Amino acid sequence: MKRKLSLAEAVEAARILFEMNAGEQGVLALAGRASLPHDTEEERTRLLTEWRAFAHASVMYALMACAPNVVVVEYLRATQGMLRGLGCSADEGEEFVDGAFSAYADPLVRLQAQECPAVFFRRLLGWEVSEVPAQNAAVVSGVMAMVLSAVMDKLEQYDYALE
């Protein structure tokens, strides 16, 4: 039997899933495995922004598939607070939503998740996937697929009791 979540619990569960999949330590470990630039502060910031945008879009997509629309709306409303918790200013939050997040949300809502690695490499490195060493592209693509699948699996475990 599925556990029933209230609106507040559903948004909190989504927020936790975002945090679990967007943590700095995990993203930097991925960068090391995939030979992504992350030595300078600027490189780390760009990498974290791109990965967090993908993670946020993944949670939004899974909510769209599993939960009532009101949960999606409330999760998206919580975005600025989540970004402030990561040290982003209001302006940086707006840039994140309008730029990086939108870049990943677009293929996901079109049911074209396979485009996300191309978006990632294009935005982070200015390269097409074909220009990225195959092993590095496979690592990033595989982790993206696992994140999306894990978030979807987790959110499918709940019923949403919003009355």
Regions found by a protein language model. Name each.
Residues S6, R44-L48, G93, A113:
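Helix-start/N-cap signature of alpha-helical segments
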Residues Q25-P68:
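N-terminal interaction modules that seed assembly of large macromolecular complexes
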Residues M1-E41:
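N-terminal leader/targeting peptides and immediately adjacent processing regions
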Residues E50-W51, V72, V119-F121:
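Short, compositionally biased low-complexity segments
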Residues M144-D159:
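Long, hydrophobic alpha-helical segments that serve as membrane-spanning/inserting helices
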Residues M60-E74, C88-E92:
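Short, solvent-exposed secondary-structure capping/transition elements
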Residues A10-V27, L76-M146, E163:
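Polybasic, proline/glycine-rich intrinsically disordered low-complexity segments
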Residues M1, H38, P133, L162-E163:
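Acidic, serine/threonine-rich, charge-biased low-complexity segments
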